[in-house]
Curated annotation (Swiss-Prot):
Gene this chain is encoded by: rtcA
Compartments (UniProt record): Cytoplasm
Name the record gives this protein: RNA 3'-terminal phosphate cyclase
Molecular function as annotated in GO: ATP binding; RNA-3'-phosphate cyclase activity
Active-site feature positions: H303 (tele-amp-histidine intermediate)
Catalytic EC class: ligase
Species per Swiss-Prot/TrEMBL record: Metallosphaera sedula (strain ATCC 51363 / DSM 5348 / JCM 9185 / NBRC 15509 / TH2)
Family under the similarity heading: Belongs to the RNA 3'-terminal cyclase family. Type 1 subfamily.
GO cellular component: cytoplasm
Length: 334
């Protein structure tokens, strides 16, 4: 059984999620101590506990320590179980982070997941980022899949719902040296259970920032009265690769400034010339379990560095990193 130190590096929930994903793929059990040791509320919170229970369900795993607040966990995967499953975080915990844990195991298996929780919440990728940036980048390495939004869930109420299914393909090596020439910018500006004009005003804020680019900017408005109150905007820039940026509505922040924030973040990412943004630079790492990866990223975050160390625990892999902002990463199976 592999020993994982949950306090090393960024010391957050990603260490656990990556360990769960890789354990389920490789069949290697692990014991993790110091779960989320560097967070204000260490130990398993509802979102992390849901990730554990999803992977336990999908692998018929033997698990101990899976309770709220637990700082130690043992996980020994068994046989993969296919089928359709529904899980509910019970809070506004991120459905995207739970999906990220399960998707690697779902590839080329008849597994679909309906996840209830937060679709657009702070400190995690909005579900539209998963749809507009994450999945299109997976397609570049030969993997397709679907994430459908059934209902939006914002902090603190939650109550959102997504369906994750159809992940399949023949994974191939991924090489992304640069972003290349910008062709277009797409996105979604959403508002739920609040005045509809907010979605349009968020787009206006984006257009103010991105007007310097002489490319089509197509941001859809999504207005719904079903789901917990909130707003947000996600952008995706398309060239040889795909970069993303996002912003969530907040009390006291105008809709225009929500849009400007997302536009400014995207502009900052694009100016690095890297192939992927700072979030995808981290999220892609786990997929070195399927193929060799070589790409440039806008910023080498502590999240990314920590994730690489978890990968090294489970896989025999050569790692080469050059630079920090931007950086170049090579992950090659031995």
């Amino acid at each position: 059984m592999l020993e994982i130190d949950g306090s090393f590096g960024e010391g957050g929930g990603q260490i656990l999620r990556s360990s769960l994903a890789l354990s389920s793929l490789t069949g290697k059990g692990f014991r993790i101590r110091g779960i989320r040791a560097k967070r204000k509320n260490p130990g398993l919170q509802p979102q992390h506990l849901t990730s554990v229970r999803v992977m336990k369900m999908l692998t018929n795993a033997r698990v101990s320590g899976d309770y709220l607040g637990s700082t130690e966990l043992e996980f020994e995967p068994g046989e993969v179980v296919e089928g359709s499953f529904t899980v509910d975080v019970g809070t506004a915990g991120s459905v995207s982070l739970i999906a990220m844990t399960a998707i690697p195991l779902m590839i080329n298996r008849r597994i679909s997941l309906r996840i209830r929780g937060g679709t657009d919440v702070p400190l995690s990728p909005p579900v539209d980022y998963m749809r507009l940036v994450f999945i299109p980048l997976l397609e570049k390495m030969g993997i397709t899949g679907k994430i459908e939004v059934k209902r939006r869930g914002h902090y603190p109420e939650g109550g959102g719902e997504v369906e994750v299914y159809g992940f399949r393909g023949e994974p191939r090596d991924l090489v992304l040296d640069s972003f290349g020439e910008l062709r277009e910018i797409t996105g979604v500006s959403h508002v739920t259970s609040l005045p509809a004009h907010i979605a349009k005003r968020q787009i206006q804020g984006v257009m103010e920032v991105l007007r310097e680019f002489n490319v089509p900017v197509k941001v859809e408005e999504e207005v719904s009265n079903e789901g917990s109150r909130g707003t947000g905007i996600v952008l995706s820039a398309h060239g040889l690769s795909i970069m993303g940026a996002s912003s969530l509505g907040e009390k006291g922040i105008t809709a225009e400034n929500v849009g400007r924030k997302a536009g400014t973040e995207l502009l900052k990412e694009l100016k690095t010339g890297a192939a992927v943004d700072s979030h995808m630079g981290d999220m892609l790492v786990t997929f070195s379990a399927f193929a060799n990866l070589e790409y440039t990223g806008s910023l080498l975050t502590q999240h990314t560095e920590t994730n690489i160390e978890v990968i090294r625990k489970f896989l025999e892999i050569d790692v080469k990193i050059e630079g920090r902002s931007p950086f170049k990463l090579r992950l090659k199976r031995k």
